[in-house]
Amino acid sequence: LLLEGGPLPDLTWTPRYVEIDAPAETLPDLIEAAQKRWPEAVIAARLPLDTETGETAVDLVRRGVRVIHVTGNEVAMDDTGRYLPEAIRDVHGALVDRSLRDAVTLIVSGGIAAAEHVAKAIACGADLVALDFILFVAWGTSLWADRSPSPIEDTDFDAEWGAQRLVNLANAWRDQLLEVLGAMGMREVRRLRGEMGRTIWFETEDAAFKKRLGDSAPLASYPAAAREEAPEGDFRWPVWLLHTTQQMARTGSPPDGHVEYRIGDSDGGFDRLAFTFEMDRDPADVPTADPAGFDMSLPLNRRGDGRPAQRIAAPWYGAGMSYGSVGYPVMYARCRAAMEMGTLSSTGEGGYPDALNEFADHIITQVATGLFGVSEATLQRAPVLEIKYAQGAKPGLGGHLLGNKNTESVAQLREAVQGTSLFSPFPFHSVYSVEDHKKHVDWLKQTNPEAIISVKVSTPTDVDMVAVGSYYAGAHIIHLDGAYGGTGAAPEIAKKNIAMPIEYAVPKVHNFLVEEGIRDEVTLMASGGLRTAYDVAKAIALGADGAILGTAELVAIGCIRVAQCEKGLGCPFGITTTDPEHAKLVDAQESWRRIVNMYTGWLWQIAGILERYGMTSISELRGRSDLLLSLE
C-alpha cells in the first residue's frame, strides 16, 4: 500500500506492507500512526534520492523509522544527476558513520534493469531492491509509447501468464546473483551489502589510468582507415579486424592500410588508445620495419634462481585453450605455430595430450582448480607450469565444459565421465592464503626442478597486491587476464562485471612493482582482449613485458565470431568442436601456417612502431605510457 501523505485511510483489509511518501518532517508521525493502525504490517518511509537523502535517512532512523525506500528515476539517477551507485553509497555511508546502519532496512529502486544492477546496488549499501519498469518489459512492453501498445493495456491480458513471466524473470536473476555470490566467495547475500572494498569504480580507475598517459585527443581526430560494413563480427572484433587479420594469415604480410587494422568498434579499451605518432600519419601509410633489425625477444625467468633462463623469440605466446574447448587439430596448429615462432602455447586446464609431445619444449601446461588431466608425468615434461587461479572472462568462477563437448577422448584425458558437464571448483581448496599460495608454487617447483612458474589471475581492484604476493610466493611470470578475454562457456553476468579491463590493470600492477623495487625480477604478461599488433604494443607501453593471445589465433584459422563455442557442433568451421568428424573441417597444417603468417605480419608492424620512436628493442617500449593518447 502506497500512501502519499495523510490522513491514513480506513481499510477493510490489513496490508502487509505500507509505504508512506510525504515530506520528511511529517514522516515519523505518519509512520507511528500507521504502526498503531496496522501493527502487523511493515511500515516504510519513501524518499527521493538527492544529496540530502543521507542526512534525512539518519534523522528518520533516530526518530524510530526502521524501513526506508530511496528512489531514483527511470534511468537510475537521483534528482541531481548522480548515478544510483554513488547515491546509494552516500546514504549507506551516512548511516554507517552514525552507527545506525543495522537499525534500518534500506530499499532502493529506480532504473534497476538487469541482474547485475541488483548485485551492484547491494554492494553499494542497499539491503534489497524494488523493481519498477523492468516488470513492464517482462510483459513485453517496449517502453516506447509511439512504437506499440503495452500488452497490459489489452483487456484480455492473462494474469496467470503475466505472473509466470515475473516468476521466470525472478528465477533468472536469482541464478545470476548466485553466480556473483559464488565469484565473491559468499553464501549469503547479506554479506554482499556494503562490500565497497571489492567494487571497482569507473571514474576512480579511469582517472588514475589517464594520469599515466601522455595526453588526450578527440576521438574524431583519430585518422582511421576505411571500415567495412558486414554482419560478421562484433564490437570488439568488427568485420574490418576479421578481414585484416585473416589477410595477414593468408599472406604473412602486414596490412596494406586500405582497411582499418588497429582498432575495433567498442567504446573503450585499446580502441580508445592511440600512439602519439598515429595522429598525424596517413592510415594507409602502415609503419613497418624488418624485425630482424630489432630485439623482439622476451626473457621469462628474471629471478636468477638457478632455473633455466627461458627466452622466447617474440613478446607473446598462446593462451590456454583446453582439449575440450577446442579440438585436437586446433591444439596441434597452435603448438606447431609456437614451435615455428620460437614461443610457447598453453594446453589450458584440460590436460596435456600425449600427441603433442613433439612440441614439448614449447608447451605450457596448466594446473587449474579441477586438476583435470594433471599428473606428475605431464608436469615434468613442460618448461613452463601455470597455476590458473582465475580467468578474466569469469573471475571467481571455475572453468566450464558442457556435456555435449565432453566426448570419449576428452573424458579420457580429463579422467571424467563422458557426456557430463565438467565444472572446476573455485577456489583451489588447498589455497586460502599467501602462505598456501607459496606452498602451491613450491609443489610445482619440486615436481619439475627445470620448470618456471606462471601464475594466472584476473584483475580485481587489488590486483596490484595480488601480483606482489605472487612474486614473493616465487612466481616467475605474473599473467594478468582481463575482462575482455574469450571464453567458450561463462555466465553472462560474470563477463565484464566482476573484474577491471586489462588496460587499467597493467599500469596499476607495473607501477606498484616498480615502487616495490622488484619490477625487473618478474615477467608481467597481459591477456584478455588483445587482438592486433597495436594492442600488444599498447599493452607493453602500459607496462606489460608481453602479451598472451587466444582469440586472435582462432581468427587467423577462420573464426568469424559466431559465438557458439560452448556447443558441441556450434562452430560452423569446426574450430571449437570436439566431435571427431566436425573437427576435420580444420586443416591443422594450413592452420599453423596461418597463425605463423599473422604473427609475422605483427612483428613487422611492431618493428615499425619501435623504429618510429627510435627504439631497437621491445623492452625499451615497456612502461612508456607517455607515448599513448586517450581518445575521448
Where are these predicted regions, by residue range?
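Conserved, well-structured core domains of diverse proteins
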Residues: 1, 182, 187, 191-409, ...
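Glycine-rich phosphate/ribose-binding loops and adjacent secondary-structure elements
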Residues: 3-4, 9, 15-167, 183, ...
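Short boundary motifs at domain starts and secondary-structure transition points
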Residues: 10, 35, 306-310
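Intrinsically disordered, low-complexity partner-recruitment/activation regions
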Residues: 12-13, 380
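Conserved divalent-metal-coordinating catalytic cores
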Residues: 58, 154-183, 187-190, 202-203, ...
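Mobile "lid/hinge" segments at catalytic clefts and subdomain interfaces of large enzymes
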Residues: 125, 135-137, 143-148, 152, ...
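Glycine-rich phosphate/pyrophosphate-binding loop
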Residues: 413-416, 422-429
